[in-house]
Amino acid sequence: MKIAYYTIRFHTPAFLGSAEQGGQWRAPPFKAQLRQWWRMVFAATHDFKPDVRVMRREEGRLFGHAWLGDDVDECGAPVPARKSLVRMRLGEWASGQMTSWTASKHRVSHPEVRQAVASDLYMGFGPLLLPSGSNNPVLKSGAAIQAGESTRYSLAYPEEHSQMIETALALMNRFGTVGGRSRNGWGSFT
């Protein structure tokens, strides 16, 4: 088992929700990111034409599953579920400290909206709201994890999977985003 230690730092605010819908550092979004980038690495090693069944089987054996109907153990006995061989831990699951939002000075117009609104409202629609009668967006509820916050990230994984895991981690470092509105650049981290 190989163990690696990293520091994760957000470059843009992140909306990672706890059960109470407040911003909180949580490991599951980062594990989901690792799985997603692992799929990209798997596809790349198969000339971007992988057999999806083979990919899902390999993913399930590495990251755990409850869906593979054809999985067997070392003795050939059927395995209905398998736990992950990848272990992950965040240094802390602290709540976000960002409790207010400074609205952008830039305004945009849209044919379906009567007045020009702050441009960040479009990028953050959902986590950001526009209160009735206001021109400036506010955070919906709870706190967000603000840009610049960081925590320690520990990862343990089988040595034989190190090349693909480390390539996936490199892709996460370059392109990773997590949380609400991450497709719009929120939750960008290295």
Language-model region placement:
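Small/polar/charged residue-enriched interaction surfaces, especially the RNA/DNA-contacting tracks
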Residues: 1-190
